[in-house]
């Protein structure tokens, strides 16, 4: 995906293992919009510890020149991921990033009905509720239906969504 030099975009960066939270804190200090999906788990002493869901991956929303300045001059310890096909910085489309964030932020457990059964891998759109507008594929796990959203073809997030909220595309 190609963007203009001064257009905001989501860039994909890699931080060293275990430094994701530090990179997040530095980006917050600089006032840069970013996203690192995390979860809270119990550490070995029973304390709650925040850990990244996707090891080493950081998403930074910035212009291309500002993104490069962050790494070279602002002290953000990360390297950008390059798209192998275009040999340019990897960029995530805004819609895909928004869908991915919304699905990670919310999971619903209610049930509902559709006019016909869903099949595995079928493309659906959520038509109501907090995930309205999100598009993804249907996955069934232990008898429950989930909407699965893919980011860059290799990162996946899922949320249980009532069947009545889904529209088959």
Where are these regions (language model features)?
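Glycine-centered loop/turn positions within well-structured domains
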Residues: 145
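Short coil-to-beta-strand transition motifs
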Residues: 120, 127-134
């Amino acid at each position: 995906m190609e963007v203009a030099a001064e257009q905001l975009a989501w860039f994909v960066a890699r931080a060293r293992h275990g430094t994701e939270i530090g990179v997040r804190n530095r980006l917050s200090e600089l006032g840069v919009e970013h996203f690192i999906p995390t979860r809270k788990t119990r550490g070995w002493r029973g304390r709650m510890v925040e850990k990244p869901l996707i090891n080493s991956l950081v998403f930074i929303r910035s212009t291309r020149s500002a993104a490069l300045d962050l790494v070279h001059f602002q002290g953000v310890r990360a390297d950008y991921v390059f798209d192998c096909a275009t040999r340019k910085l990897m960029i995530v489309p805004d819609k895909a990033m928004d869908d991915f964030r919304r699905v990670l932020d919310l999971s619903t457990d209610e049930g509902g009905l559709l006019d016909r059964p869903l099949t595995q891998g079928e493309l659906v759109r959520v038509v109501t509720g907090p995930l309205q507008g999100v598009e993804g594929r249907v996955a069934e796990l232990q008898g429950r239906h989930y909407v699965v959203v893919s980011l860059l073809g290799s990162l996946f997030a899922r949320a249980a969504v009532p069947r009545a909220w889904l529209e088959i595309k």
